[in-house]
Regions:
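Bacterial N-terminal signal peptides that target proteins for export
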Residues: 1-8
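Hydrophobic h-region of N-terminal signal peptides that target proteins for export
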Residues: 11-19
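Short non-domain terminal segments
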Residues: 8-9, 23
Length: 154
């Protein structure tokens, strides 16, 4: 009986430890986004639907808002499916060309790689993909299976 209790206690401690190490929006990703992206993508910027109403020229000079979990996820799952991944990608997925926002993930290669890995881990195993909602060119649209891999704990 004592061995069973000890084994259960050890198992619970291991599970709690694994959960504590998983990145969350509140503890990890949100503060990094605020620090690295907030100056251009903060609370004063338009949300996705308002940003999309701007003309093409204006959208080139006004950044969309990504200061919260819901506004961030707009560019992961829908309606801006995959946009976050395409912008932050280090180029190892996109044929050697980093996304246009990758450079802002940190001041050094090491910091950028660390922050990118944190976002990838937070999204979930296999959730990092560059697909849009609809197919474009040779790139197919995102699948239900790909979207189901997004975990992104709050």
């Amino acid at each position: 009986m004592l061995k069973t209790r000890l084994a259960l206690l050890l198992l619970a401690a291991c599970a709690a430890s694994a959960t504590a190490q998983e990145p969350t929006w509140r503890k990890d990703v949100g503060p990094m986004v605020a620090a690295k992206c907030g100056a251009c993508h903060g609370a004063k910027m338009p949300e996705y639907s308002d940003w999309m109403q701007l003309g093409d020229d204006k959208r080139k000079t006004v950044a969309p808002r990504i200061d919260s979990n819901p506004t961030f996820m707009t560019y992961v799952v829908w309606p801006g499916t995959g946009a976050m991944m395409r912008r932050l990608d280090d180029g190892k997925v996109a044929g050697g060309k980093p996304g246009n926002m990758y450079q802002y993930l940190g001041g050094s290669d090491e910091e950028r790689a660390k922050n990118l890995q944190m976002v990838k881990t937070w999204l979930g195993d296999g959730a990092w993909n560059l697909n849009r909602w609809n197919a474009r060119g040779d790139v197919p649209g995102v699948t239900k299976e790909q979207l189901e891999k997004v975990q992104a704990k709050y």
